[in-house]
Amino acid sequence: MFYNVLKAKKLVNNDENKIEKKILLQDKESCFDIIALEKNEIIGEHSSAVDTAVYVLDGKIEIHFEAEKYVLEKGELLMFKKDHQHKVLALKDSKFFLIKV
């Protein structure tokens, strides 16, 4: 069996003008990534081909879906269905898990 203990918050850093992403697991359309955004950084509008969950490890982010927006803070989880256009704005230096299944 394979076991690996990781310190999630230490896997990525909040670097100025750089979105940092580390792929933890990936298989075809599915993934489990950790992403770091500096305050005011934006991940531009996009969609996912599979259902997605975002779990905030640290900081505060805002996810925009057309006319709706959700603010997520440390410890909060947002799940959404595939094919929805959205963008992400970091309201504070933030780290979050991106889970696509």
Which ranges hold each PLM region?
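A short, N-terminal "cap"/entry segment at the start of jelly-roll beta-barrel domains
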Residues: 1-29, 64
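Conserved short histidine dyad/triad with adjacent acidic residue
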Residues: 18, 33-48
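Glycine- and acidic-residue-biased ligand/ion/polar-headgroup-sensing regions
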Residues: 50-62
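A cytosolic small-molecule/anion-sensing beta-strand core signal
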Residues: 57-58, 73-74, 92
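Short acidic-glycine-tyrosine-enriched beta hairpin
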Residues: 67-82
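Ligand-binding loop in jelly-roll beta-barrel domains
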Residues: 82-101
